[in-house]
Amino acid sequence: MTVYTASVTAPVNIATLKYWGKRDTKLNLPTNSSISVTLSQDDLRTLTSAATAPEFERDTLWLNGEPHSIDNERTQNCLRDLRQLRKEMESKDASLPTLSQWKLHIVSENNFPTAAGLASSAAGFAALVSAIAKLYQLPQSTSEISRIARKGSGSACRSLFGGYVAWEMGKAEDGHDSMAVQIADSSDWPQMKACVLVVSDIKKDVSSTQGMQLTVATSELFKERIEHVVPKRFEVMRKAIVEKDFATFAKETMMDSNSFHATCLDSFPPIFYMNDTSKRIISWCHTINQFYGETIVAYTFDAGPNAVLYYLAENESKLFAFIYKLFGSVPGWDKKFTTEQLEAFNHQFESSNFTARELDLELQKDVARVILTQVGSGPQETNESLIDAKTGLPKE
């Protein structure tokens, strides 16, 4: 049996200008454009291997070691579009193997909790679509492939690029102009770093799909957001990224996170994605910025309680004097800093005259893990396969 395979890793992206609301639920067309930062795959990634052979009996998906349904409409839409593009290639070149007619085996693994507010669906669909596109050797551009990923999970289209990415909402009813484009590569502003504070890795009560449609249907504040707030902020944030203006980027990121969660609260019944710990982290960030007299850290929260803190490498010692004091006892610090660096963080805190009350030491018991990462690249083809090339089945 000849088995054709391809494997790809894809990154998590965290929106700094949030996507929330669909104007077309089948095509995943958004009510507003959005912007995100792609995070390094050294720390957060999905690895997906795709295989095909004429002997395969049915399309099959394994996710994190378990068989998983592949029949849902979103996945089927992606597979159909990818097969159609491959079929068009085969019709023009009779020498090509007819991969589009064969069934697929797809094996995928995350190195972070699924459905925990860490954009796992974005990385997952970006990896799935990219792996099959590589398997089929499709010639389309990354932006064109991002349109297919969008049908799986809206924010997945942004994980097709590294660096700083815009998902342009488009205007066409068929969605052909709703796709991801890169604002800047990770190498253009490599100093951007991120610290994820995992408050909870439990699956959220209200899914993003359910939540955003409730907001669209019931929130008056949402209408103001998509018509006035987001279009203006989109241009300001894009300019800040191009000009590497962290102060503006940080302010707009925090304000947009607040705006997004305000529309969730304005939905009826209201949606609570953040919890008390999330709110205390927000207050803590503002306290740190006020302490230094400049904006050195920005927070953002997706549809969940976990915080993503953005900061520049040049301010790492200032920020981590406090972060390490608070969260140094929770998992996630391995091999990220030397013993000397950690001791320096402690020394800087001790000399800061910052009080325990201002620091909110109680926060340390409410954060389960820290993930220390930075801006990173888009999907990468890899030789690390999850599929046995002889059998076409997941490796044991």
From Swiss-Prot:
<dbReference type="Pfam" id="PF22700">
    <property type="entry name" value="MVD-like_N"/>
</dbReference>
<feature type="binding site">
    <location>
        <begin position="153"/>
        <end position="158"/>
    </location>
    <ligand>
        <name>(R)-5-diphosphomevalonate</name>
    </ligand>
</feature>
<dbReference type="InterPro" id="IPR020568">
    <property type="entry name" value="Ribosomal_Su5_D2-typ_SF"/>
</dbReference>
<dbReference type="InterPro" id="IPR036554">
    <property type="entry name" value="GHMP_kinase_C_sf"/>
</dbReference>
<feature type="binding site">
    <location>
        <position position="209"/>
    </location>
    <ligand>
        <name>(R)-5-diphosphomevalonate</name>
    </ligand>
</feature>
<keyword id="KW-0067">ATP-binding</keyword>
<keyword id="KW-0456">Lyase</keyword>
<dbReference type="InterPro" id="IPR041431">
    <property type="entry name" value="Mvd1_C"/>
</dbReference>
<keyword id="KW-0547">Nucleotide-binding</keyword>
<keyword id="KW-1207">Sterol metabolism</keyword>
<feature type="binding site">
    <location>
        <position position="74"/>
    </location>
    <ligand>
        <name>(R)-5-diphosphomevalonate</name>
    </ligand>
</feature>
<dbReference type="GO" id="GO:0004163">
    <property type="term" value="F:diphosphomevalonate decarboxylase activity"/>
</dbReference>
<keyword id="KW-0752">Steroid biosynthesis</keyword>
<dbReference type="GO" id="GO:0006696">
    <property type="term" value="P:ergosterol biosynthetic process"/>
</dbReference>
<dbReference type="InterPro" id="IPR014721">
    <property type="entry name" value="Ribsml_uS5_D2-typ_fold_subgr"/>
</dbReference>
<dbReference type="InterPro" id="IPR029765">
    <property type="entry name" value="Mev_diP_decarb"/>
</dbReference>
<keyword id="KW-0753">Steroid metabolism</keyword>
<comment type="subunit">
    <text>Homodimer.</text>
</comment>
<dbReference type="GO" id="GO:0019287">
    <property type="term" value="P:isopentenyl diphosphate biosynthetic process, mevalonate pathway"/>
</dbReference>
<dbReference type="GO" id="GO:0005737">
    <property type="term" value="C:cytoplasm"/>
</dbReference>
<keyword id="KW-0756">Sterol biosynthesis</keyword>
<feature type="binding site">
    <location>
        <begin position="19"/>
        <end position="22"/>
    </location>
    <ligand>
        <name>(R)-5-diphosphomevalonate</name>
    </ligand>
</feature>
<comment type="pathway">
    <text>Isoprenoid biosynthesis; isopentenyl diphosphate biosynthesis via mevalonate pathway; isopentenyl diphosphate from (R)-mevalonate: step 3/3.</text>
</comment>
<dbReference type="GO" id="GO:0016126">
    <property type="term" value="P:sterol biosynthetic process"/>
</dbReference>
<dbReference type="InterPro" id="IPR053859">
    <property type="entry name" value="MVD-like_N"/>
</dbReference>
<protein>
    <recommendedName>
        <fullName>Diphosphomevalonate decarboxylase</fullName>
        <ecNumber>4.1.1.33</ecNumber>
    </recommendedName>
</protein>
<comment type="similarity">
    <text>Belongs to the diphosphomevalonate decarboxylase family.</text>
</comment>
<dbReference type="GO" id="GO:0005773">
    <property type="term" value="C:vacuole"/>
</dbReference>
<comment type="function">
    <text>Diphosphomevalonate decarboxylase; part of the second module of ergosterol biosynthesis pathway that includes the middle steps of the pathway. MVD1/ERG19 converts diphosphomevalonate into isopentenyl diphosphate. The second module is carried out in the vacuole and involves the formation of farnesyl diphosphate, which is also an important intermediate in the biosynthesis of ubiquinone, dolichol, heme and prenylated proteins. Activity by the mevalonate kinase ERG12 first converts mevalonate into 5-phosphomevalonate.</text>
</comment>
<dbReference type="InterPro" id="IPR005935">
    <property type="entry name" value="Mev_decarb"/>
</dbReference>
<dbReference type="Pfam" id="PF18376">
    <property type="entry name" value="MDD_C"/>
</dbReference>
<dbReference type="GO" id="GO:0005524">
    <property type="term" value="F:ATP binding"/>
</dbReference>
<keyword id="KW-0444">Lipid biosynthesis</keyword>
<dbReference type="GO" id="GO:0005829">
    <property type="term" value="C:cytosol"/>
</dbReference>
<keyword id="KW-0443">Lipid metabolism</keyword>
